[in-house]
Amino acid sequence: MNLVYHSTRNSEETATASEAILKGLTSDGGLFVPDSIPKLNVALEDLTKMSYQEIAYAVMKEFLTDFTEEELKNCIANAYDEKFDTTEIAPLHEADGAYYLELFHGSTIAFKDMALSILPHLMTTAARKNQVKNDIVILTATSGDTGKAALEGFKDCLLYTSDAADDRISV
């Protein structure tokens, strides 16, 4: 069953997961949300034995239903690879009865690497699926770690202003 996404402002505007990924926002400025929240078909105990990549696939396949298994696994493998300084990607540690999930092992050392590492792979796969031939151009203006984390996966050309702490143009 394919999950359908609709606008938060107008339920008549719908899209597949790949279309929603490419559009980003709905035409009325809303966000794409799924018509229903799928159940995860993995027992909680089994999740503790799975790698980050396996968990990512188990979750994403329920939401990105127009992607094939091969497409999703390829996106995940390319996103969560040697860019992270540990094969665990997001290690879980226990100390004094509390658990800590380390989300800083990505290329920019920001928790945003977790989500933004896969975005370019999902976008290029979605573009192929929807016969989009144009290049994907991401323009961001930021002074924080979100922009850096987003650009890391897309970096073919990065422009930094002269006021930036790290002045450079990278092509």
Where do the language-model regions lie?
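Well-ordered mid-protein domain cores that form the structural environment of catalytic cofactors
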Residues: 99-156
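Single conserved hydrophobic/aromatic residue that forms the stacking wall/gate
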Residues: 160-171
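Small-residue-rich anion-binding loops in enzyme active sites
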Residues: 31-109
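Short conserved micro-motifs on helix faces and helix-strand junctions that flank
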Residues: 26-27, 109, 141, 163
